């Protein structure tokens, strides 16, 4: 994201455009003064550094054309229009893609599979704006509104709003559904060749039961990452669709702000558009854990980072302790030997703290050398604590 924002910053500011314009010589002087106050006359690298400094201080910067408005108010005021078109089209497109992908995979080699494959190739190849232009022509035949009605329009009417939503949403649905159909169909074909599908059929399960309980889930799991790319693709297609159908959304703001060199507005738009797929990928990872039992099993049987660090620390402590031991400061005791039994009778061994508590007389009785600080009992290294009195 940082690299993308850096490239966009320098590209936008290399156009020579300014966000303010003048209609007279008097206005020109005022505009020059204001541009100087905004720092437009500073070197580009200085403005770049100032932008990041402002951003990390918690400010999105100034909207030059109207300093009284904040950047977040402008963008988030248009977000509902964008999310409505993008998310609805993505939901419908992915649902249709899964359905047609399942049908195409289950009936591979049949006429319906061939027809679906032709349509998939067609709609994947044709850009969304070309589909949109074709739908604009069709809108007149079905008496559908050619322009989108935004949420903040003065003449907003829910019935007309739904009718005006059909064409923009369909423009994005075709590509999304085609992409999902292609991926799901390939996964279905691969799953159908697995041994557990043959086993399910040999048990007498119907085709519907096999498809629903075995093929469907195992085909969808590998297709989950496609949801992230699908959302990114829907946002990318939204740039042209919003311009084509008059959707006052985030993409439309981005286009206008680039043309007027509203750098701060452009950068926040890029952050927002880049952030949506990022959040979607995090959400998809969480979904993966729910739908894929292999991940749950691996997580349950795996070792956390904290546990790994704990093991490393304990191992290093164990090595340090053994480095201090030599033949002069340690005494070997074999399991079930007379010495071991005597220690058990004395209840001198503390396995919890890896210590042995003995008096000087007990050490003499057990024939433990006075210089010994440790007792080696099997794989245990027990520190000797001398009890006085």
Swiss-Prot record:
<keyword id="KW-0812">Transmembrane</keyword>
<feature type="transmembrane region" description="Helical">
    <location>
        <begin position="1"/>
        <end position="21"/>
    </location>
</feature>
<feature type="transmembrane region" description="Helical">
    <location>
        <begin position="270"/>
        <end position="290"/>
    </location>
</feature>
<comment type="subunit">
    <text>The complex is composed of two ATP-binding proteins (OppD and OppF), two transmembrane proteins (OppB and OppC) and a solute-binding protein (OppA).</text>
</comment>
<keyword id="KW-0472">Membrane</keyword>
<keyword id="KW-1003">Cell membrane</keyword>
<keyword id="KW-0571">Peptide transport</keyword>
<dbReference type="Pfam" id="PF00528">
    <property type="entry name" value="BPD_transp_1"/>
</dbReference>
<comment type="function">
    <text>Part of the ABC transporter complex OppABCDF involved in the uptake of oligopeptides. Probably responsible for the translocation of the substrate across the membrane.</text>
</comment>
<feature type="transmembrane region" description="Helical">
    <location>
        <begin position="115"/>
        <end position="135"/>
    </location>
</feature>
<dbReference type="InterPro" id="IPR000515">
    <property type="entry name" value="MetI-like"/>
</dbReference>
<dbReference type="InterPro" id="IPR035906">
    <property type="entry name" value="MetI-like_sf"/>
</dbReference>
<dbReference type="GO" id="GO:0015031">
    <property type="term" value="P:protein transport"/>
</dbReference>
<feature type="transmembrane region" description="Helical">
    <location>
        <begin position="83"/>
        <end position="103"/>
    </location>
</feature>
<keyword id="KW-1133">Transmembrane helix</keyword>
<dbReference type="GO" id="GO:0005886">
    <property type="term" value="C:plasma membrane"/>
</dbReference>
<keyword id="KW-0653">Protein transport</keyword>
<protein>
    <recommendedName>
        <fullName>Oligopeptide transport system permease protein OppB</fullName>
    </recommendedName>
</protein>
<feature type="transmembrane region" description="Helical">
    <location>
        <begin position="161"/>
        <end position="181"/>
    </location>
</feature>
<feature type="domain" description="ABC transmembrane type-1">
    <location>
        <begin position="79"/>
        <end position="289"/>
    </location>
</feature>
<feature type="transmembrane region" description="Helical">
    <location>
        <begin position="220"/>
        <end position="240"/>
    </location>
</feature>
<dbReference type="GO" id="GO:0055085">
    <property type="term" value="P:transmembrane transport"/>
</dbReference>
<comment type="similarity">
    <text>Belongs to the binding-protein-dependent transport system permease family. OppBC subfamily.</text>
</comment>
<dbReference type="GO" id="GO:0015833">
    <property type="term" value="P:peptide transport"/>
</dbReference>
<keyword id="KW-0813">Transport</keyword>
